[in-house]
Regions:
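A short beta-strand-loop structural module common to alpha/beta enzyme folds
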Residues: 34-43
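Conserved small/polar residues in nucleotide/adenosyl-binding loops
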Residues: 125-131
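Histidine-anchored nucleotide/phosphate-binding helix
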Residues: 14-30
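Charged helix-capping and loop-helix junction motifs
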Residues: 19-21, 51-56
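A short aromatic-anchored loop/beta-hairpin motif
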Residues: 97, 105-113, 117
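Short, glycine-rich nucleotide/cofactor-binding loops
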Residues: 3-18, 43-50
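Mid-chain, well-packed structural core segment of small domains
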Residues: 57-99
């Protein structure tokens, strides 16, 4: 099964990603093909250059061809992107200060990026945080 994660809830990247999902990806026990991850709000902070979780994730993402994206508005607010709020959603905002392979964007850019490798549909009645999305 192919899935994409959306990290939206408070500390999802610290707790669910850092202590559960990432270790499973590293030891190949996650049992699904994660094709992408999308980060909102303070969850993007784990992707700053030098952050141990972000550096580990960047390595896995490169190996597994996983798409990593941060919300462009969230990144602009935290000075982790070059661009303006008016450019958000257009694909013009560029991530900065983040681990290798991370891009900034909004849902239109996420859908375009994952389109060729789209996740499988998932039942939204069984969601846990971080959200498993079918995009």
């Amino acid at each position: 099964m192919k899935i994409a994660y959306v990290f939206k809830s408070n500390m999802a990247s610290t707790f669910q990603l850092g202590t559960m999902i990432l270790p499973q990806l590293e030891d190949n026990s996650h049992l699904v093909n994660v094709v992408g991850m999308f980060f909102f709000d303070d969850n993007i902070m784990c992707l700053q250059k030098g952050n141990p979780v972000g550096e580990r994730l960047a390595k896995i993402a490169k190996e597994k061809k996983m798409h990593l994206m941060v919300c462009d508005q969230c990144a602009v607010r935290r000075e982790l992107a070059e661009g303006t709020f008016e450019q958000c959603g257009s694909g013009e905002v560029k991530a900065k200060g983040l681990v290798d392979g991370v891009v900034a964007g909004c849902f239109p850019q996420l859908y375009s990026a994952l389109g060729p490798n789209a996740p499988d549909p998932v039942s939204y009645t069984h969601l846990t945080l971080p959200t498993i999305c079918s995009v």
